[in-house]
Curated annotation (Swiss-Prot):
Protein name: Endonuclease MutS2
Entry's Gene Ontology BP terms: mismatch repair; negative regulation of DNA recombination; rescue of stalled ribosome
Enzyme class: hydrolase
Residues engaged in binding ATP: G328, P329, N330, T331, G332, G333, K334, T335
Domain Smr as annotated: residue spans: 702-777
The keyword DNA-binding is annotated on this UniProt entry: yes
EC numbers on record: 3.1.-.-, 3.6.4.-
PANTHER family associated with the record: OS10G0509000 PROTEIN-RELATED, SMR DOMAIN-CONTAINING PROTEIN
Annotated PROSITE patterns: DNA_MISMATCH_REPAIR_2, SMR
Family from the record: Belongs to the DNA mismatch repair MutS family. MutS2 subfamily.
Length: 778
């Protein structure tokens, strides 16, 4: 898009509004490079990124990014083979740290579905080894001792030598106190010296490094520390050499990853920019607009971002509408309306949020052109009219159906009659070429053009005749009218003069009366619309609050359920462990006394959960009422425990059901829906175990035929427990064939029971698939 429109609309000032929300220099650079695009996929991506970041902020309102400096130049130097200094390494260290924090944040992020942002988070690289290498550089700007063993050794020796120097000097301070001007150790030329009185300079052997301005003090490095100081100087040289070697070595390690680190820095900046956009949305109540596919524009309560206390207006530029002509006097806000439309489009096509209400839509234009303000050139000696016309001629040669055109005071600066005619001719040319145009003018002739011409619409800026001030409200569909008579009358002009003037333009008065009626209708519609918007805003706030509360309740519910599951698992584990111990004790005894059996049964009973009476539970009763049977439902006949399907309902309310090969007529109380079986309260029945003797030891048989499914499963559970208590090796379970429901339940139960060694169907002469023989572990 041409740079001139960005300058005219002051787009750089708009971008500056986002700067306070940025945390990184990379994000700042990307913001400054931001420009509008006509590529729909890029705009959609930017909109999707903002929406996902908004969702992220709902779950993580304090999401932040570590501040980083620009490292493009640093990475370029690395790629060129240069070695980095400590300050440059610290910049890289900061970027790697920011990258790692973002990766950790993304890994731990929950309850947010990301697509576009996920791509950026997942593209960040992980450099654990490099991060370890860069720990050698302290944030204060020095290399740590642990950077290398040699550096640590050199610094230990320096420390020891410096300690010796201090000890020697402290001794001399005490011994030669009368020879010194003051009792301190001074420093000159990087050497530790004593401030000796000039009269005693020959009393202390050493090297003179300085003399005070008065000549009374001579700074002498005692001979006892000269050798130590020279050793320290040599060690300092070794230290500098080792630090250079470390810088070179780490530069070589980082060099192969320079491009990846630079890319990570760009991603960090991009995420920072998206974050800044959302912070702007929160601060200014901005929105992410919808994207129109046909250049349709619908802006709801749109504001100019650079105007303080700007009045919000609605603008609708339909698909078929080619021109909106804003008529009326100056100083009413017409130019601001032009800029608001243009700037909103530029912001949206740059991937920025707009200052409007939810539901706003923007189009996509390849170019936006504008002729706004007095751009005459003094050097070219052009008049206002010539300047505007030169610009318009240039624009008319460039615009096409994919352009948006903004024209301020079209035809101004020349004879009104000729200017109006020229303005209409230009608008007609643009209309025929189907170029969307918004134009302002104070020529009344263009009102008629807007009314009579298809696909052209009048508009105006509201003027309050009571206060004699513009309200800056945009009234689309209502042409502007001159308020000269009302203003003159309120300012004190004679009513006679005003009356004479009004009689001379009776025809215009008729038009003004029509316009006045339109204004009143528009104002009434606007009031109703404002009320609707207030209700919508309240609903949105309530919806957000309810959604937040719902999410919090869900999280709390899940937390409580997890706790309950853990507690239940612990109880079950404890119960199983205790029951195993009881059974183990029973198995270890060859003969059991009656009272021991009773005690063991009592212990096992204590392990069973307490019964809960659900018959009075209103929630379950209500749920049961809701589950009305219908044709096609699977049922279980209570008297037989057989499974069937409802085929029809008789007039008397009874049901016909197909149970296997048998057709039955049942009342609703005689069957249960299959899906409700799990909800019925468990009823435990006493099961009698019939012992019989054989060569293999005691055996027992349980007959489940004719039982309901739940009843059969409860009896089976009790039967197996008693069989284990009686130390039986094998039992028979008769379940019949039927629909196979009970047989399947028996099989699943035996598969779960860890005391069962094996099980299988009985021989054909003993019941076949209608009975199961169970063998227990010894």
């Amino acid at each position: 898009m041409n740079k001139k429109i960005l300058e005219t609309l002051e787009f750089d000032k708009v971008k500056a509004l986002f700067e306070p929300h940025l945390l990184t220099e990379q994000g700042l650079e990307q913001l400054r490079q931001l420009a509008p695009t006509a590529k729909a996929d890029k705009i959609k991506q930017a909109f999707a990124e903002m929406k996902e970041m908004q969702a992220l902020f709902v779950e993580q309102p304090h999401f932040t990014i570590l501040s980083t400096k620009e490292i493009a130049g640093v990475c370029k130097r690395l790629e060129m083979g240069a070695d980095l200094n400590i300050e440059e390494f610290l910049l890289l260290k900061r970027v790697l740290l920011a990258s790692r924090e973002l990766q950790n944040f993304y890994t731990n992020l929950e309850n947010v579905s990301l697509e576009e942002l996920a791509l950026w988070f997942e593209k960040l690289h992980d450099f654990p080894q490099l991060q370890g290498n860069l720990q050698a550089f302290n944030d204060a700007g020095f290399i740590e001792n642990f950077a290398s063993e040699e550096l640590a050794r050199i610094r230990r020796k320096i420390h020891d030598s410096e300690s010796q120097v201090r000890d020697v000097l402290q001794d001399l301070l005490k011994q030669k106190a009368q020879l010194l001007t003051e009792g301190i150790v001074a420093s000159r030329n990087g050497r530790q010296v004593l401030p000796v009185k000039n009269t005693y300079r020959n009393k202390i052997a050493g090297v003179v490094h300085d003399i005070s301005a008065s000549g009374n003090t001579v700074y002498i490095e005692p001979r006892e520390v000269v050798k130590l100081s020279e050793e320290i100087a040599s060690l300092r040289a070794d230290e500098r050499y080792e630090m250079l070697r470390i810088l070179q070595e780490i530069s070589e390690r980082v060099r192969p990853h320079a491009a990846e680190i630079a890319n990570d820095a760009w991603i960090i900046g991009h995420l920072d920019l998206i974050r800044a956009k959302v912070r702007f949305i929160q601060e200014r109540q901005a929105v992410v607009p919808q994207l129109s596919e046909n250049q349709e524009i619908q802006l709801l309560h749109v504001c100019h971002p650079l105007v303080k206390n700007a009045v919000a207006n609605d603008v609708y530029f339909g698909q078929d509408l080619t021109a909106i002509v804003i008529t009326g006097p100056n100083t009413g806000g017409k130019t601001i309306m032009l800029k608001t439309l243009g700037l909103t489009q530029v912001m949206a096509q740059s991937g920025l949020p707009i200052l409007a209400d939810k539901g706003s839509r923007v189009g996509i234009f390849e170019e936006i052109f504008a002729d706004i303000g007095d751009e005459q050139s003094i050097e070219q000696s052009l008049s206002t009219f010539s300047s505007h016309m030169t610009n318009i001629v240039d624009i008319l040669g460039k615009v096409n159906q994919h352009s948006l055109l903004l024209l301020d005071e079209l035809g101004a600066g020349t004879d009104p009659q000729e200017g109006a005619a020229l303005a209409m001719a230009i608008l007609e040319d643009l209309r025929l070429r189907q170029i969307k145009t918004m134009a302002t003018t104070h020529y009344p002739e263009l009102k008629a053009y807007g009314i009579e011409t298809a696909f052209v619409q009048n508009a105006s800026m509201e003027f309050d005749t009571a206060t004699l001030r513009p309200t800056y409200r945009f009234m689309q569909g209502v042409p502007g009218r001159s308020n000269a008579f009302e203003i003159a009358k309120r300012l004190g002009l004679s009513e006679v003069i005003v009356g004479d003037a009004s009689q001379q333009i009776d025809q215009d008065n008729d038009v003004n009366r029509i316009i006045e009626q339109l204004e009143e209708q528009t104002l009434e519609s606007r009031k109703r619309l404002d009320n609707i918007r207030e209700v919508e805003q309240e609903n949105l706030k309530m919806n957000r609050a309810l959604k937040k509360l719902y999410n919090e309740l869900n999280r709390e519910k899940e937390t409580e359920l997890n706790k309950a599951r853990e507690q239940a698992a612990e109880i079950v584990d404890m119960a199983l462990s205790e029951s195993d111990q009881i059974l183990k004790n029973l198995h270890s005894k060859s003969q059991l006394k009656p009272h021991e059996i009773i005690e063991a049964k009592a212990k096992l009973k204590k392990l069973a959960p307490e019964k809960v009476d659900l018959s009075k539970n209103k929630v379950l009763q209500k749920a049961k009422k809701k589950r009305a049977p219908k044709v096609g439902d699977d049922i279980v006949v209570l008297s037989y425990g057989q499974r069937g399907t409802l085929t029809s309902q008789l007039k008397d309310g009874r049901w016909e059901a197909q149970v296997g090969l048998i057709k039955m007529t049942l009342e609703e109380k005689e069957f249960d829906l299959v899906q409700a079986q799990q909800e019925k309260p468990v009823k435990k029945k006493q099961v009698n175990v019939v012992k019989r003797t054989s060569g293999r030891g005691p055996q027992a048989r349980l007959d489940l035929r004719g039982k309901r499914y739940e009843e059969a499963m409860n009896e089976l559970d009790t039967f197996i427990d008693q069989a284990l208590l009686n130390n039986m090796a094998q039992v028979d379970i008769i379940h019949g064939i039927g629909t196979g429901v009970i047989r399947e339940g028996v099989t699943k139960y035996l598969q779960r029971n860890k005391h069962v060694k094996s099980f299988g169907y009985a021989p054909q002469n003993a019941g076949g698939s209608g009975a199961t023989i169970v063998t227990f572990k010894g």
